[in-house]
């Protein structure tokens, strides 16, 4: 298996056919936002292929001069799930970005939120923690959703360094009024996420 970069058309097709089914609306960036970042050279769509068959995908946000990669979305296609492909894809990503200090991301916290989804959130967190990620040292809230910061990288990455990098990604993308309203980095213990907003308000 290998990772191949997808182009704009392939990302657009993947978004419409799979991602809108795989992720709830409040967690999914607009396609327009992804394509703009890709046009700027700041977003990579990687497909997991077995020969010519697409099995999964990883969307990764990059910032110039920042030695970290933000894993924005990870998914496998229907029909090939529960085969360990997610863990294999994380290993391939770690090799793909081996020159960087780490890959980090956000996994929805199992605290708060809709109690009917709590078990799913708990399983997602466990998946990342079983596959080389560790807690980054802080929680955050993005557009009303409570996340935990996770990282797979060198052991010397401190929570302070990761938080600074994490802020840089979002501050570079959103105007100050959107950032202040919808991005809470970090989310202090006991603090409540701000009311959710529409990604399109950017």
Model-identified regions with their sequence ranges:
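A short, internal acetyl-CoA/4′-phosphopantetheine-binding micro-motif in the GNAT/acyltransferase core
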Residues: 74-81, 109-111
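Short amphipathic alpha-helix that is part of the acyltransferase structural core
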Residues: 1-33, 161, 165-168, 181, ...
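Conserved GNAT acetyl-CoA-binding A-motif
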Residues: 97-120
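Conserved acetyl-CoA-binding loop-helix of GNAT-fold acetyltransferases
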Residues: 76, 82-96, 120
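A conserved beta-turn-beta hairpin within the catalytic core of GNAT-like acetyltransferases
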Residues: 62-71, 81, 99-101, 146
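Active-site rim helix/loop that mediates acceptor-substrate recognition in acyltransferases
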Residues: 21-51, 59
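Conserved beta-strand in the GNAT
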Residues: 47, 53-62, 68-75
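C-terminal "cap" of GNAT-fold acetyltransferases
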Residues: 120, 141-202
């Amino acid at each position: 298996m290998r990772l191949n970069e997808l182009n704009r058309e392939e990302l657009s097709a993947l978004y419409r056919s799979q991602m809108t089914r795989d992720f709830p609306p409040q967690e999914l960036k607009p396609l327009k936002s992804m394509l703009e970042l890709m046009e700027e050279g700041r977003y990579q769509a990687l497909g997991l292929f077995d020969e010519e068959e697409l099995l999964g995908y990883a969307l990764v946000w990059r910032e110039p001069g920042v030695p970290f990669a933000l894993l924005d979305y990870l998914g496998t296609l229907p029909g090939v799930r529960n085969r360990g492909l997610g863990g294999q894809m994380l290993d391939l990503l770690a090799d793909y970005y081996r020159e960087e200090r780490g890959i980090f991301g956000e996994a929805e916290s199992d605290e708060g939120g809709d109690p009917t989804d709590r078990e799913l959130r708990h399983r997602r967190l466990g998946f990342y923690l079983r596959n080389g990620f560790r807690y980054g040292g802080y929680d955050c809230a993005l557009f009303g959703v409570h996340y935990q910061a996770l990282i797979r990288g060198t052991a010397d990455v401190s929570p302070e360094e990761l938080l600074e990098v994490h802020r840089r990604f979002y501050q570079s993308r959103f105007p100050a009024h959107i950032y202040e309203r919808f991005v809470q980095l970090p989310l202090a213990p006991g603090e409540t996420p701000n009311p959710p907003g529409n990604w399109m308000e950017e």
